[in-house]
């Protein structure tokens, strides 16, 4: 993926995350639940003082430090490995985008705005950036696993 496309994709993904959070805050009261796809997904507004899926509540200094380290390392890795396959680039793009999206909330608000509730399973409320991070990490693990198995 060319550097320009990577940067534009990063900006777009972070913007989508921030716009989704802005929309939730503007249209749903704190703690209110509104069905989006009845029985499947509801939207709610939650202020999360923890990490993805509400773990490690009230440890902001820890999350800021970890976020800076992970994003910094991902950018360093991209810069020093210019010929990564598209899947690793996509994984790192999602991880960086998700990290930046939640980092903006932490710096601006001291909490992260969460809004997606899966009605069909007992699961934490999460946001778009959490989704980026989750998919990015899963994709990276698959890439690394494939490398180990096949030497790619």
Curated annotation (Swiss-Prot):
- Residue ranges annotated as transmembrane are 5-25, 61-81, 84-104, 125-145
The record's principal subcellular location, in a coarse class, is membrane
Q: What is the enzyme's main class?
A: hydrolase
Task: Give the enzyme's EC designation.
Answer: 3.4.23.36
Q: Which reactions is this enzyme annotated as catalysing?
A: Release of signal peptides from bacterial membrane prolipoproteins. Hydrolyzes -Xaa-Yaa-Zaa-|-(S,diacylglyceryl)Cys-, in which Xaa is hydrophobic (preferably Leu), and Yaa (Ala or Ser) and Zaa (Gly or Ala) have small, neutral side chains
Report the subcellular localization. Answer: Cell membrane
Per the record, the GO terms for biological process are: proteolysis
Annotated metabolic or biological route of this protein: Protein modification; lipoprotein biosynthesis (signal peptide cleavage)
Output one GO MF annotation. Answer: aspartic-type endopeptidase activity
Recorded hits in InterPro entries, A to Z, give: Peptidase_A8 (IPR001872)
The record places the active site at 114, 130
Tree of life domain: Bacteria
- Keywords recorded for this protein, A-Z: Aspartyl protease, Cell membrane, Hydrolase, Membrane, Protease, Transmembrane, Transmembrane helix
Q: Which family does it belong to?
A: Belongs to the peptidase A8 family.
Task: Name it.
Answer: Lipoprotein signal peptidase
């Amino acid at each position: 993926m060319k550097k320009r496309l990577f940067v534009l994709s990063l900006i777009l993904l972070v913007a989508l995350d921030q716009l989704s959070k802005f929309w939730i805050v503007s249209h749903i009261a704190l703690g209110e639940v509104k069905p989006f796809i009845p029985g499947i997904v509801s939207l709610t507004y939650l202020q999360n003082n923890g990490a993805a899926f509400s773990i490690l509540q009230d440890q902001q200094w820890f999350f800021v430090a970890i976020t800076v380290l992970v994003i910094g390392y991902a950018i360093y890795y991209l810069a020093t490995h210019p010929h990564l396959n598209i899947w690793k680039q996509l994984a790192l793009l999602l991880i960086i985008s998700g990290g930046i999206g939640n980092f903006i909330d932490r710096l601006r608000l001291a909490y992260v705005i969460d809004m997606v509730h899966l009605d069909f399973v007992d699961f934490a409320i999460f946001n778009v950036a959490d989704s980026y991070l989750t998919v990015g990490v899963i994709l990276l693990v698959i890439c690394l696993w494939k490398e180990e198995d096949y030497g790619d």
